[in-house]
Amino acid sequence: MGDPRRRFKKTYETPNHPWIKERIEREKELCRKYGLRRKREVWKAETILRKYRRQARRLISDRTEQGAKEAVQLFNVLKKYGILKIENPTLDDVLSLTVEDILERRLQTLVFRKGLARTPRQARQLIVHGHIAVNGRVVTAPSYMVTVEEEDKISYAKNSPFNDDNHPERAKIVGLVAEETQTQETE
């Protein structure tokens, strides 16, 4: 009776030990800096990074022609998402990546960095409520990984009230961005 159980694979790995103070503080700081709602989002980013680093370690030991092809493919994927910004990367560059490199490529972070929102939390709210479009298509997932090609195409959605230049909240956002650029220029 009832529907069959839906089996799914977890997209993250939890920490081995739940109560390590340094890890908890580091995760809390990442959640605050990037406007994440749960530590699970940090764990997902760590799992993505772990996957790339594991592949790089395997390719360092693999000296065959196939290993070289796979290394080039890994570099292309990381460059496509803007995680690896170096022109001629090596596998050591992949091993030196951090969780912040992954979190910087989330749509939520890029909306905040582009000045479409005042805070990372507001960026998340705008995305979830359907006010942000990527390449003309509304994206409602704050964890959406933005490619380098799509980065310039992030904007307010066509049907969003934020698309109007006279929207009062948008005026606050633009004013805040102008203040930040002035303080950076004076420094």
Swiss-Prot record:
Q: Which GO terms describe its molecular function?
A: rRNA binding; structural constituent of ribosome
- Name the domain of life this protein comes from: Archaea
Record keyword rRNA-binding present: yes
Per the record, its GO cellular-component terms are:
small ribosomal subunit
- Positions of the S4 RNA-binding domain: 105-174
**Gene Ontology biological-process entries:** ribosomal small subunit biogenesis; translation
Q: Which PROSITE patterns match?
A: RIBOSOMAL_S4, S4
Which SMART domains does the record cross-reference, listed alphabetically? Ribosomal_S4 (SM01390), S4 (SM00363)
State a single Pfam family of this protein: Ribosomal_S4
Enumerate the UniProt keywords alphabetically.
Ribonucleoprotein, Ribosomal protein, RNA-binding, rRNA-binding
What is known about its subunit structure?
Answer: Part of the 30S ribosomal subunit. Contacts protein S5. The interaction surface between S4 and S5 is involved in control of translational fidelity.
- Give a short account of what the protein does: One of the primary rRNA binding proteins, it binds directly to 16S rRNA where it nucleates assembly of the body of the 30S subunit. With S5 and S12 plays an important role in translational accuracy.
Record-stated family: Belongs to the universal ribosomal protein uS4 family.
This protein's name: Small ribosomal subunit protein uS4
Q: Which organism is it from?
A: Methanocaldococcus jannaschii (strain ATCC 43067 / DSM 2661 / JAL-1 / JCM 10045 / NBRC 100440) (Methanococcus jannaschii)
The gene designation is rps4
